[in-house]
Curated annotation (Swiss-Prot):
SMART domains from the UniProt entry: REC, Trans_reg_C
Biological source species: Escherichia coli O6:H1 (strain CFT073 / ATCC 700928 / UPEC)
Biological process according to GO: regulation of DNA-templated transcription
Protein name per its UniProtKB record: Transcriptional regulatory protein BaeR
Domain Response regulatory: 12-125
Protein function: Member of the two-component regulatory system BaeS/BaeR. Activates the mdtABCD operon.
Molecular functions (GO terms): phosphorelay response regulator activity; transcription cis-regulatory region binding
GO cellular-component term (any): protein-DNA complex
DNA-binding annotation, residue ranges on this chain: 131-234
The keyword Phosphoprotein is annotated on this UniProt entry: yes
Sequence positions bearing 4-aspartylphosphate: D61
Amino acid sequence: MTELPIDENTPRILIVEDEPKLGQLLIDYLRAASYAPTLISHGDQVLPYVRQTPPDLILLDLMLPGTDGLTLCREIRRFSDIPIVMVTAKIEEIDRLLGLEIGADDYICKPYSPREVVARVKTILRRCKPQRELQQQDAESPLIIDEGRFQASWRGKMLDLTPAEFRLLKTLSHEPGKVFSREQLLNHLYDDYRVVTDRTIDSHIKNLRRKLESLDAEQSFIRAVYGVGYRWEADACRIV
């Protein structure tokens, strides 16, 4: 295995390739493009490495000594959504791989241009970055909303909410910073045509805020925007 010292903010690319010259060529091009490549030449070394040091993207050759690329891709997908680019020597093999739906993000056929590989890497990382940031933000959210059970918790502590309070909490916390008018909140709260007043929302918000602050007095949760409505001040919720 060939691994080079990297800056922690540099995207890490795992190259799984058993041809030394081709592997070194990819290392050179990826380093020149400001990536941090690591080369593994034997299939049996891949899973332990990925579990211990997850890369940002994997270039995975199909034919390898030890565990083959097809099996590795399937196994990695069992525990990770790391972008995977499969590399094959046969263009007709790509159709078969697509049909198997193994979970790869892209496919490259040998012989290829190293510049093409770098371009694919850039495109895939750019595409995956917003999604991964959202997932990371979700995983760190202190507010968990369980739609199926109609339950919500803040930092592991359950909130005792009415159905109306639950809907308001979900609506506001799903879009932090967005100001919702009372009319918008009423529309989210009631899907029928019952006659209610703006004061109904104010009453529900008051009760919801009180319950939240009883769990965390230091956190600002819901702020009133004079003449407009309300906005969520804390982190976005995680909906499960």
